[in-house]
Amino acid sequence: MRENKKPYIILNAAMTIDGKIASKTGDPKISDEFDWKEVHKLRTQVDGIMVGKETILKDNPKLHIKFHEHEGYYRIVVDSNLTIPLDSNVISFQPEIYPTLICSTETTPIEKIEEYEVNNVKIIRSGTGKRVDLVKLLPMLYEIGIHSILLEGGASLNWSFIKDDLIDEIRLTIAPWIVGGKDAVSLVEGEGFEKMIQARRFKLLEIIHRDSYVVLKYKRSDK
């Protein structure tokens, strides 16, 4: 864990050989049952799961744990303007086991915040611009006991964490497929860095072969 009291961030994703996490229609079904069980096992080891609002709007996930015993964790949604529906699974499904935090900006109207709070959702505000300030947000999450987070996308949120150099570890499952398409969703999107020298560096720790699937585990490199 870092000394500056930020949660340990693990980016977890499954992608195709050509780096896509979803097809051009948004179909994200890449992981097989074995990988899903491994992902759910990994979820039991963290204090929170984080996704962006687009993941909620497109997939409406429950962000819960199957296959393994557990004590629950926080579901954390980055949603600058509080736009996800109040009947989303991430809000309505088993909130007593998986309490939900939504991270918005400081400009979010109090009236809108109250709509979510009456549905047992805690709102944390960070940043005065159009986007949530992740650098300021993470210490706030640490202070309430969230010391490790599994980041599960989507691509825009992945970029925000990469841009701000907040990723500590990466776990990638690579499926033996090529989906193609300029409109298919890549692992990391956003504006990207202008020069390769700006790219974030990671050190390969482990390679796991399973049938034609490969799991790659990386940790941040400070070199």
Descriptions of predicted regions:
Residues M1-K223:
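Enzymes that bind and transform nitrogen-containing heteroaromatic metabolites
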